[in-house]
């Protein structure tokens, strides 16, 4: 059986995606969030089941076996060698970002982030009393690029001391390629900016695209965040690994992590990582990537042939895609009503990602083909009923 066509029942488990679906109209298609509809890799499920039966769930450390698993994965899946002691564990990417903001910035200082932006980045910045400094990307026919002049102007402002980069970019699915990363790193080095790069979607880059670790280009000022979360749909077990090469940067980060009371990692995460960061796990991720690429192509073909006023940004990395609905000429409220009541779709509105997301919608590609076909048929019927 193709497990990528198996739809998981989320009822009764407190699942966030399931809870959102429960509030929607009956028959609603849920392409909300960035969590897979199908089960995670068999190697992880088996390892967790075996571990659960041991009944041993105590404090857990990042020992040598754990670190070697991360090093092996970075070499196999990312073609990048890291040193075991450059791995810093934390309780999640956003937890790690919050710690970094407190370690390296002061209240009132500016933090640069590319917009449209994953909303929790902006929340983390604001919640720590720092200022969100938007570096709005340029968009042309759904293709996004950095506004380099604006980025340098903001990096050169002494009030701005930190940048959050997301690669692959969420929500646009853009991959920042090596020439772009080199240029970002050169500017950050010139102006003394610390860069926190969220790379938790890195392993989902599609063919022809590669996510190089930011620390390859900015080892003195860069922090790379990695995780099982997206590649294996493991976001509910809080965890992340930060890769920090510079010793002073690492020392300062660890001091703040201690203040934030890190404690120990979740033993289930330890077990899942060692099982997933293997050749079997990597083969599963590559098969999952092929499935999401087919879903994307299925959507793109339907829009081009059946609903030409709608279009998708290119999918370079991640399993979310960015749908452009601007040609429908609907206000935010009208668009929400059209999608939720007429199309019966639950997904992330573009406005969730800031003003630069207006007129767009983020869709999750890690669904079954049957679910996507149902969504496309419902969308086409509502689209044509409106006379588009």
Language-model segments: residues:
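Conserved core segment of the aminotransferase class I/II
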Residues: 46-47, 221-293, 301, 383
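Active-site phosphate-binding strand-loop segment of PLP-dependent enzymes
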Residues: 138-209
């Amino acid at each position: 059986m193709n497990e990528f066509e198996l739809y998981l029942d989320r009822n009764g488990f407190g699942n966030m995606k399931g809870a959102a679906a429960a509030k929607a109209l009956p028959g609603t298609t849920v392409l909300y969030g960035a969590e897979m509809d199908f089960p995670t890799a068999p190697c992880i499920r088996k390892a967790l089941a075996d571990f659960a039966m041991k009944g041993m769930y105590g404090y857990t450390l990042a020992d040598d076996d754990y670190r070697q698993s991360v090093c092996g994965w970075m070499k196999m899946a990312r073609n990048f060698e890291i040193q075991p002691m450059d791995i810093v564990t934390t309780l999640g990417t956003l937890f790690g970002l919050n710690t970094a903001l407190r370690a390296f910035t002061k209240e009132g200082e500016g933090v640069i982030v590319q917009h449209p932006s994953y909303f929790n980045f902006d929340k983390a910045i604001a919640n720590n009393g720092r200022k969100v400094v938007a570096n709005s990307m340029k968009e042309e026919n759904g293709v996004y690029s950095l506004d380099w002049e604006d980025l340098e102007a903001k990096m050169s402002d002494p009030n701005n001391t930190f940048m959050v980069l997301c690669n692959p970019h969420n929500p646009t699915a853009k991959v920042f390629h090596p020439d772009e990363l080199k240029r970002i790193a050169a500017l950050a080095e010139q102006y003394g900016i610390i860069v926190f790069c969220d790379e938790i979607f890195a392993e989902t880059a599609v063919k022809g695209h590669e996510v190089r670790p930011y620390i390859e280009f900015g080892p003195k000022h860069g922090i790379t965040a990695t995780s099982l979360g997206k590649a294996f749909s493991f976001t509910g077990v809080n965890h992340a690994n930060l890769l920090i090469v510079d010793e002073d940067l690492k020392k300062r980060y660890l001091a703040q992590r201690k203040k934030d009371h890190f404690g120990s990692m979740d033993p289930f995460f330890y077990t899942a990582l060692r099982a997933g960061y293997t050749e079997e796990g990597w083969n599963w991720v590559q098969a999952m990537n092929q499935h999401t690429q087919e879903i994307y192509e299925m959507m793109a073909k339907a829009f081009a042939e059946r609903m030409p006023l709608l279009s998708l940004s290119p999918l370079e990395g991640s399993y979310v895609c960015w749908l452009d609905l601007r040609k429908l000429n609907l206000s935010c409220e009208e668009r929400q009503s059209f999608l939720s009541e007429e199309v019966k779709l639950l997904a992330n509105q573009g406005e969730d990602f800031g003003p630069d997301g207006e007129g767009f919608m983020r869709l999750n590609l890690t669904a079954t083909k049957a679910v996507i076909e149902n969504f496309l048929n419902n969308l086409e019927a509502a689209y044509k009923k409106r006379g588009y």
